[in-house]
Amino acid sequence: MKVSNLKITNVKTILTAPGGIDLAVVKIETNEPGLYGLGCATFTQRIFAVKSAIDEYMAPFLVGKDPTRIEDIWQSGVVSGYWRNGPIMNNALSGVDMALWDIKGKLAGMPVYDLLGGKCRDGIPLYCHTDGGDEVEVEDNIRARMEEGYQYVRCQMGMYGGAGTDDLKLIATQLARAKNIQPKRSPRSKTPGIYFDPDAYAKSVPRLFDHLRNKLGFGIEFIHDVHERVTPVTAINLAKTLEQYQLFYLEDPVAPENIDWLKMLRQQSSTPISMGELFVNVNEWKPLIDNRLIDYIRCHVSTIGGITPARKLAVYSELNGVRTAWHGPGDISPVGVCANMHLDLSSPNFGIQEYTPMNDALRDVFPGCPEIDHGYAYLNDKPGLGIDIDEAKAAKYPCEGGIPSWTMARTPDGTASRP
């Protein structure tokens, strides 16, 4: 498609929740009839703030600009608010950035992965979640996924080792099933929240993987997510203990505020490390990559600003022997899923892709979702990102907003904790 004097004419935010999770999609329209792009701007925990950022700030900034000038729009968009690299504006910018890549692909008549250099592989290996209340339930769920063809699984007991509930009796019951590990008691007048005992969790994880390796062997790859919920010293001890179980990687063992501890962890353990789900700036990975402190970049693409910074991060990682592991939870839209996978296909240092199964409503609202077959994802070869949105159907699933209960985490004595 060849178009002269192409301009952005409209920018809008589409909020929808067909999977039960609030999603934000940016649609950029142009003066060429029928030519538009879609991008993911989902920050579920602050969905209406992102919508406001797009509608009130990004839209006026974009209208009248040439949509093919992706790099210039990204760079000027980042600095346009002076203060930069916050998750709300980054997600807003991500929605714009992905939509511009979608438009560029449609203009070129090529999938985005071809614009990024072309395919490096034929399919995208996926890992899925296999949670359970105890070792046997996790094992059963893994066996079910193996029958579906998955070769990589993330293994968790309850909510990152706890029960994902504020019912202390249920937590105690579930942890008791995990080889009689008892969580600490809470004081009187318990503050509402999701209670989690990091010490009981840290004791239960090695027993989980001992059970799984004894029952399932070493023919399946295991991932575990610490979710930054333990002290740095506990994380180091956990990584050391888990070496014998040969994890594919241990995710986010420390909080972003404690990344200096990764040097000590690296000195004491050979367990592969994935880090960065909560990072909001590509430069946060630089010292970890430069000092060989991680094996995988664990990156939420929309929170760093979209495809433009993500492809640079992937290349920098490649030059230093670090592989990609883009974040793929349920709280990114199918548009964001496709953006991840275009990066996956075109990155020689691809490591693995997290995948959360989509229900029928999601696939109905977003035609063009990836095909999933025997643990692999396959994108179509349509120009751009290859995915669309049915706005009328999307409107049938309004967003609710609010604070997700799982983020209201507390330790047994009632102290607020990282979720």
Swiss-Prot record:
Catalytic activity from the UniProt record: D-gluconate = 2-dehydro-3-deoxy-D-gluconate + H2O
Protein's UniProt keywords contain GTP-binding: no
Main enzyme class: lyase
Entry similarity comment: Belongs to the mandelate racemase/muconate lactonizing enzyme family. GalD subfamily.
Gene Ontology terms: biological process: amino acid catabolic process; carbohydrate catabolic process
Annotated source species: Salmonella enteritidis PT4 (strain P125109)
EC number: 4.2.1.-, 4.2.1.39
Protein name: D-galactonate dehydratase family member SEN1436
The protein's role, per its UniProt record: Has low D-gluconate dehydratase activity (in vitro), suggesting that it has no significant role in D-gluconate degradation in vivo. Has no detectable activity with a panel of 70 other acid sugars (in vitro).
